[in-house]
């Protein structure tokens, strides 16, 4: 699904899915999943959003908003705690895209997109795989660890939450420790 926020359809399309408009991204994905299920192309048990980096917001929030709609989720080097993201090494450059916690409107937008802050007790979440490179300079690996721990703590069904950390990788594409140093 080409959800709003991507660059596929130009700048207006991109702006329709950034900052306070970020909820459009996961609402578009949810609408696409509902359409495919309603038309009989698939069932929820076969649907699995996958997103990496900022796409972790898309995957994480689609599942925290509609866990019943998906059989699994994959979050790769995902930005999953948008509230704390600004405090990380790469946080300030992301303010233009996501907003800032230093003003009320920005904080509300970041809270809306923060998957970690929408994980609730008693909800049956689908199976989850979170992957992260330990040397990631863009999205700190603690985000995936924190999200995995939260899902494991609240998810009482038999669906597993798995975390894979690659100690020789960064933000994808082979950022080894040697390359970072």
Task: Please provide the spans of the model-predicted regions.
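Active-site-proximal cap/loop segments of hydrolase catalytic domains
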Residues: 1-181
């Amino acid at each position: 699904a080409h959800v709003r926020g991507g660059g596929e359809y130009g700048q207006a399309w991109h702006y329709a899915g950034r900052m306070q408009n970020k909820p459009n991204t996961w609402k578009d994905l949810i609408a696409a999943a509902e359409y495919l299920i309603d038309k009989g192309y698939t069932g929820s048990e076969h649907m699995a959003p996958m997103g990496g980096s900022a796409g972790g917001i898309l995957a994480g929030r689609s599942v925290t908003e509609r866990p019943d709609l998906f059989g699994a989720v994959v979050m790769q080097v995902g930005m999953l705690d948008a509230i704390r993201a600004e405090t990380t090494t790469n946080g300030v450059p992301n303010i233009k895209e996501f907003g800032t916690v230093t003003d009320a409107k920005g904080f509300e937008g970041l809270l809306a997109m923060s998957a970690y802050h929408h994980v609730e007790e008693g909800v049956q979440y689908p199976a989850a795989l979170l992957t992260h490179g330990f040397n990631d300079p863009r999205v700190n690996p603690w985000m995936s660890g924190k999200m995995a721990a939260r899902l494991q703590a609240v998810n009482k069904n038999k669906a597993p939450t798995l975390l894979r950390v690659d100690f020789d990788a960064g933000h994808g594409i082979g950022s080894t420790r040697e390359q970072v140093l």
